[in-house]
Design a protein with these regions (language model features):
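Hydrophobic or amphipathic, alpha-helical segments that drive membrane association/targeting
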Residues: 1-75, 205-240
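Short helix/loop segments within enzyme catalytic domains
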Residues: 50-57, 142-206
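Catalytic zinc-binding patch centered on the HExxH motif and its immediate surroundings
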Residues: 71-91
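Hydrophobic, aromatic-rich membrane-embedded alpha-helical segments
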Residues: 93, 128-144
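Divalent metal-coordination and catalytic microenvironments
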Residues: 95, 114, 158
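Short pre-active-site segment immediately N-terminal to the catalytic Zn-binding motif
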Residues: 96-110
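Membrane-interface, cytosolic juxtamembrane amphipathic helix immediately N-terminal to a transmembrane helix
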Residues: 109-113, 117-121, 185-221
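Catalytic Zn2+-binding segment of zinc metalloproteases
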Residues: 116-133
Length: 240
């Protein structure tokens, strides 16, 4: 590997393993940053969830949650119609009082089956891992693009699971009623426009990463490796 510092050629045969040091430094520092970022995201989400005003779950919600295969359900005292799945190790479906009061029985079931699919697939953990990776690997724009694409796929998959049970009409009605929560989690209304296109029978093309994303990923990766090489050259030069 030859970066702008040209440090490899200056090390001689004895230092040939040094060629692996810059990539290793990037991997280790990225892994550390990723672990810290994921931990901070988990801590923040836990604090936000702890602040939610929880109230006893009404019998009809318990019954519908059991029908949807939801093991853990939480009832939130909020007037806005909100539902989301949260919890990295023990996914829990949160439903607000406003959602139960506003939605019809089939629409409520559509929401519950949608969120049950997220819980079954451990979507909160997957989404947190992808988001943390995209934020840490900012020099790899392709990671952010891939993360957003996977989130969209998970929403479409959850919709398909709900539609198979309650039908398209109930799912569409729920999508019109529900709102987004303040916490950036696996909420029911995520990627609403894309999901509406599917419900309307409109074609959804499988997007490909733009060339600009690939180009930026290549350039930023090269710059990161070159910078790591330069830093390593400085360390080698300063060694006794």
């Amino acid at each position: 590997m030859a970066g702008p510092c040209g440090w490899i050629a200056s090390q001689g045969n004895f230092w040939w393993p040094a060629a692996y040091v810059p990539p290793l430094l990037i991997v280790l520092s990225t892994a550390l940053a990723y672990t810290i970022r994921l931990g901070l995201m988990t801590l923040r989400a836990s604090r936000e969830l702890a602040r939610l005003p929880r109230v006893p779950v009404p019998p009809n919600l318990v019954r519908n949650a059991q029908a949807a295969g939801i093991d853990r359900i939480a009832y939130v005292g909020a007037g806005s119609p909100v539902a989301f799945c949260a919890g990295l190790t023990r996914p829990t479906v949160f439903v607000s009082e406003g959602a139960v009061a506003t939605l019809s029985e089939p629409e409520l079931l559509a929401v519950l089956y949608h969120e049950a699919d997220h819980a079954r697939r451990h979507e909160p953990l997957r989404r947190a891992a992808r988001t943390a990776a995209a934020e840490v690997l900012t020099f790899l724009p392709i990671v952010g693009w891939w993360s957003e694409r996977q989130i969209a796929r998970s929403e479409l998959s959850a919709d398909a699971a709900a539609e198979r049970v309650v039908g398209r009409s109930a799912l569409a009605g729920a999508l019109l009623v529900m709102t987004a929560p303040a916490i950036p989690l696996a909420a029911f209304v995520g990627h609403a426009e894309l999901r509406a296109r599917r419900l309307l029978g409109m074609g959804i093309d499988e997007p490909k990463p733009p060339r600009a994303v690939w180009a930026a990923t290549f350039v930023y990766s090269w710059l990161a490796l070159s910078l790591a090489g330069c830093l390593f050259e400085v360390v080698v030069a300063l060694r006794p």
